[in-house]
């Protein structure tokens, strides 16, 4: 099925529109890109195979960020038994919009067929002050398909004294198993609002992350135990670096919550440093992959360059 959101993204009189269509197929135990069509400044490098037949694909946006009116539309089809990992070579950026407050949008639509596994593991996105960011993810799964994906979003760059004082970020996730919704979620963050500091909101956290997985081989209890091990390591690193967690600095170590939904697990993280949230998510990804395949995951080498 095709997931359609309630309203299409508004057409912009300015900005660049770019699209990318990918089709991944399994051939003789190896996943290949059998379809690769792009329009505008959005494309992929050649596939990489650091772990046997799993296809690693880096999605490139040469301009390096979204400005007023830019629109990215990415569509991915994973045919039966394909194993596809999608990532990005560097942090994404959504810069301040113009006086017309034109949206800067990215829509990613993924279809995963029976027996296939798709992983969407991008590097973090930085939403700058005055941005009007829209980020939409729609995933359609066949019975017997697997999906793991995450998003890590930095609201401003406080370490550089660049705060998210105005603008907005509108995030929408829709994950379906055939015609049945597993997750429908809308989040909106408004720059400079009480939501960013209030206890009922982000409570001062400037980096937020969400990981979702259909992995049934790992229980929520195992995930929570793994998270505690990762957080213990982060606490030790923070202490060694002199970053003690205090009441005025509650997110020197991230806050993590796990929700076990029917056929889907959702992990949410609040923090102050993207690198810490990436440590949580990559650690969990390795555990999930080992449980699913019985083999250790090999991280994309672009993450270390």
Outline where the language-model segments fall.
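Structural motif
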Residues: 83-85, 117-119, 146-148, 209-210, ...
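Preference for bulky hydrophobic residues occupying beta-strand positions
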Residues: 22, 74-76, 110, 139, ...
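N-terminal intrinsically disordered, cationic/polar leader segments
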Residues: 2-3, 9, 17-19, 23-39, ...
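A generic structural signal for ordered alpha-helices
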Residues: 22, 50, 54, 115, ...
